[in-house]
Design a protein with these regions (language model features):
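GIY-YIG nuclease catalytic motif and its immediate N-terminal context
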Residues: 1-41, 45-51, 55-58, 62-77, ...
Length: 93
């Protein structure tokens, strides 16, 4: 990494309540987990509590956003299913 560029992370959360994963990115995945679990994100509020199941650190925000986009794609979801079979999306609502 060069200069003042900060590392960005891609994270995967799991909701046992919804039986769904959530993929996001940011500088501090543990802080984001607390926010999601506290209901501070409208999109994930109904799945509380959330558990952090995977984190990847990338050197730039662009790299993290590309990886996040990949993990949300069909191929990326399949990769997550293979890596974390116990955390497969089950509900289709």
């Amino acid at each position: 990494m060069g200069g003042s560029e900060e590392a960005y992370s891609v994270y995967v959360l799991w909701s046992a309540k919804l039986e769904k994963r959530y993929v996001g990115s940011g500088k501090d995945p543990k802080a984001r987990l607390r926010e999601h679990s506290a209901g501070q994100s409208t999109f994930t509020r109904g799945g509380r509590p959330w558990v952090l199941i995977h984190t990847e650190v990338h050197e730039t925000k662009i790299e993290a956003l590309r990886r996040e986009r990949f993990l949300k794609s069909g191929v990326g979801r399949k990769w997550l299913d293979e890596q974390f079979p116990q955390f497969r999306n089950r509900r289709k609502d």
